[in-house]
């Protein structure tokens, strides 16, 4: 969608690049693990080199779910992984781009948080804590660098149809007792999918592109729900 609007895009993921984008002249890709301490620096340096020295926007989209484990059942492995991917990696990427954005006296950052970033009743403790942390970091960056003409906002999507996230998870490892306490909350949102009004990836992408563009000038430190009113409960 960003490419369709004329943007130059540098993508990074632990998975391979989408095949349809491979030959696009304005798209570059680095296959890497964002949890590696060196990766954020490598990503930003490569982006600057390939696209003429500027970085106008950063979209922190990468993230992982937990298994809805509560504080009494979460493993160290799950906790560390969620914090590393959902919180530490985006902070490191922001740290790297801030220097460039301050020098060019402009820049827009958008972090993808979650409904779990503003609630304690929709996910496990690791995912919830990581997304709450990302919202806090978003507000801190927005306030700290507003005089440098740098904006930082976050979006909080609800469930997204067609992502296949839950299909990739081992249901046997889920905290079933915790899931029972969340059932009605999840049910109140999943009915949107049943009625054909569930959100799709493009419904999240459009607000992301708005916030990372100059069309959203003045919007800074905002936490935007994209969940068809799920955030009202």
Swiss-Prot record:
Gene3D superfamilies: NAD(P)-binding Rossmann-like Domain (3.40.50.720). Pathway: Secondary metabolite biosynthesis; terpenoid biosynthesis. Pfam families: adh_short_C2. GO terms for molecular function: oxidoreductase activity. NADP(+) binds at residues 33, 95, 127, 131, 160. Coiled coil: none annotated. GO terms for biological process: terpenoid biosynthetic process. The active site is at residues 127, 131. Its EC number is 1.1.1.-. Belongs to the short-chain dehydrogenases/reductases (SDR) family. This is Short chain dehydrogenase trt9. It comes from Aspergillus terreus (strain NIH 2624 / FGSC A1156).
């Amino acid at each position: 969608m960003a490419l369709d609007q004329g943007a130059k895009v540098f993508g990074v993921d632990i998975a391979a690049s989408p095949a349809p984008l491979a030959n696009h002249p304005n798209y570059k890709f680095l296959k890497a693990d964002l949890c590696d301490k060196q990766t954020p620096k490598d990503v930003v340096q490569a982006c600057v080199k390939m696209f003429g020295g500027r970085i106008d926007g950063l979209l922190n989209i990468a993230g992982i779910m937990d298994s809805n484990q509560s504080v009494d059942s979460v493993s160290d492995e799950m906790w560390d992984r969620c914090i590393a991917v959902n919180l530490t990696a985006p902070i490191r990427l922001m740290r790297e781009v801030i220097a460039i954005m301050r020098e060019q006296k402009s820049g827009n950052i958008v972090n993808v948080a979650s409904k779990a970033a503003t609630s304690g009743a929709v996910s496990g403790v690791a995912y919830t804590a990581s997304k709450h942390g990302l919202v806090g970091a978003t507000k801190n960056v927005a306030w700290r660098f507003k005089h440098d003409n740098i904006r930082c906002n976050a979006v909080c999507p609800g469930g997204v149809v067609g992502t296949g996230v839950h299909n990739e998870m081992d249901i046997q490892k889920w905290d079933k007792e915790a899931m029972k306490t969340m059932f009605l909350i999840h049910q109140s949102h999943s009915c949107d999918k049943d009625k054909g009004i569930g959100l799709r990836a493009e419904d999240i992408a459009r607000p992301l592109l708005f916030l990372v563009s100059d069309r959203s000038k003045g919007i800074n430190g905002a936490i935007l729900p994209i969940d068809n009113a799920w955030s009202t409960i």
